[in-house]
């Protein structure tokens, strides 16, 4: 009898334990009671919608805390909508599906946008003056909005290509426009510059301007860039007077691919009076070093400012070792070529020299050049602030 009672007691305890387990589990997630039948909620970067179809034991509700995801429920279908992803990085959000006391999580994924415009390694287009049209590979996973800043420039995106067209430039001057693209409201506008320029566009009258190494004043020589020198030789030449009778001619190089003027150091430019052989000599105004070597230490990249002004800063091109070729001197020698043994002295010390084309049709107020660390920066000044240089021998 005792044995039978023990067995009965054990059975009651097992029944009680089993009942307690079921009661404790009530209200917690039970996997498998909400089933995902199908879903298409992995998106590219565009704003778009997808759905999740479920089988659930009761009415379905859904929750997602990500602000770029919105949801609605229509029976067993959950509608999911995402905004555009204006980041290169992908993003994920957790969608929590609930039915009664049960829930199930599923991930909403959206990839970052992809934009790839291939100019063959270049970051801007530098063209000749002839009419131009070319389609460039262009991949964008977001819809593009494209415009241009100039009537002579057009850009059309279609079938994975951006077709850029420019009308013939017959203005006689370099010109620059911009292709402006964005991914619609909320995205930042991006630009690609397109310049049309040939060597002949550089011909004309210029301010050959600089900060005077003695006074710091912004001054200039009225000058001309021409395609023929006084001896009838073809090329590119900068001509200017350093007195009423003495004309200097500085030979220039021309890089047509990059639209850059190359300046070779220590070129014989002409005579000052009957005794002095004038040369352009590169100068690091910080260290005080000068160099008599016949090398290309300085370049001047042609630019077109927003008002149409043609502008070229004469800057260091990195070939003078640790020295900075940001300035130059007009230097007198007792003969040519320029050598240490025949130097006489500097006539003009030119800090941050630049060329600015004089154009009637452009806002041609000269641009001041000043030092900001190692960088150059431009600021418009009035023409009254710019003084024609009146050279005085300083040696």
Descriptions of predicted regions:
Residues 36, 40, 49-81, 133, ...:
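Surface-exposed binding patches on compact interaction domains or structured appendages
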Residues 88-101, 172-185:
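A short beta-strand micro-motif common to beta-rich folds, especially ectodomain repeats
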Residues 12-42, 100-107, 111, 191, ...:
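Bacterial Sec-dependent N-terminal signal peptides
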Residues 1-5, 22:
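Positively charged n-region of N-terminal signal peptides that target proteins for export
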Residues 216-276:
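Central antiparallel beta-sheet cores of small beta-barrel/beta-sandwich binding domains
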Residues 121, 198-223, 238-241:
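Tryptophan-anchored aromatic micro-motifs
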Residues 22-51, 116-135:
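Beta-sheet-dominated interaction scaffolds and their linkers
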Residues 256-395:
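Beta-sheet ligand-binding and adhesion/scaffold domains
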